[in-house]
Curated annotation (Swiss-Prot):
Protein known as: Uncharacterized protein HI_1388.1
Top-level lineage group: Bacteria
InterPro entries cross-referenced by the UniProt entry: Tauto_MSAD, Tautomerase/MIF_sf
Pfam families: Tautomerase_2
Classification lineage: Bacteria, Pseudomonadati, Pseudomonadota, Gammaproteobacteria, Pasteurellales
Originating species: Haemophilus influenzae (strain ATCC 51907 / DSM 11121 / KW20 / Rd)
Length: 128
């Protein structure tokens, strides 16, 4: 699950392009097939979103949940790719983006009636 937070006025019109950037970055950075993760957009009203004073209304928070196992360099590459692509494709400055990768052990994941450590048919590798 990926969650993206931002001001409704800025985030709502960009949802489709943001999803495309995130899916492409996950594919290029982690070799995850496009569309494999759910993305939830939380479009907040200005009075519901207090962000740092030195950020613009473009301020966007991206939280990415992953099964643990990827190398530090792989995760850093993904983060830097997202910063770059968001600025290049959507005009959102890196200064206005916050990205958090949250990892949990495979046994803490549940999907398709099994836990992540029981899945033997993933079409991507979590140990990259």
């Amino acid at each position: 699950m990926i969650t993206v937070f931002g001001l409704k006025s800025k985030l709502a019109p960009r949802r489709e392009k943001l999803a495309e950037v995130i899916y492409n970055s996950l594919h290029l950075g982690l070799d995850i097939p496009k569309g494999k993760h759910a993305i939830r957009f939380l479009c907040l009203e200005k009075e519901d979103f207090y962000y740092p004073f030195d950020r613009s209304d473009d301020y966007t928070v991206i939280e990415i949940n992953l099964m643990a196992g990827r190398m530090e360099g792989t995760k850093k590459r993904l983060i830097k790719m997202l910063f770059s692509e968001l600025e290049y494709k959507l005009g959102i400055r890196a200064h206005d983006v916050e990205i958090t990768i949250k990892e949990q052990p495979a046994h803490c994941w549940g999907f398709r009636g099994m836990t992540g450590d029981e899945a033997r048919d993933l079409d991507y590798d979590i140990y990259v």
